[in-house]
């Protein structure tokens, strides 16, 4: 009697009908094949010399040993660690110490067929999610308990990723009004989603990212007294006076910032298909920054926007990028950055 084996989970079936039913089910089976291949690969790797990888540090190519002790990204002798690493982010992050990074901002390929030069952005969804599991696991491992991990994406793709993340998650919307999808026959896309992930109570600098008040609030509510009402959030018999904060309203989870499209992004735009605005990158960094020694990791450096924003705010960062042209683009942009001097208001 012939045996039928699932190439993905390696489960064996004696009857073809059972095998067909297994292969056609909606929920994908566990990918034991890749797990087994990794085990074999690790066994082989431990028997040969450690591999070398190229690192681009301030436009200088050096070599780093994969077997070297885990590194800690920090300010050393008054100098910030600010570098772009040419190489795979998963392998790169494996070298970073556990619980040592304040902010991780991920703008991965969305698996929608974008051209990034030397890598494919079109995989089977199962393979794409398995790959996402790998880099997200490293991001979570290196993240401090009070740190924040941000992941960009379209909602319909991030929904699959979100359920696989085992720490706290909030949804943020980046809403842009100056860019729409070219289709005229369906809902026009005017937003991207951001997963905001954290282990424990995260650092959140609300006063650094306050937003302008709406005209409605300033006209109808500011300075007025509201009497107590019954309900879940009742404050008893107290009355509340609404006052406008000098720096604006508390930040909301819908961020309204223009995309780099048309005239709005002409001065900032570079040759990269998914470049994010510096204003957006800076907002995420300022919201989660944890003092002068803040450490940011950018697994997919791409156009370098997150790294440029980090350098402007004078924090430590490492960005990973596999495309040599984009490594050069990042370093070119970083070479033109002037650090912004922060003035503390007493």
What does each model-identified segment do?
Residues 330-331:
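Conserved SAM-binding loop
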Residues 156, 208-210, 335-346:
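Class I S-adenosyl-L-methionine-dependent methyltransferase module
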Residues 73-320, 324-327:
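Core catalytic lobe of class I
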Residues 35-58:
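Intrinsically disordered, low-complexity regulatory regions of eukaryotic transcription factors
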Residues 1-40:
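C-terminal recognition-helix end and immediately following basic linker
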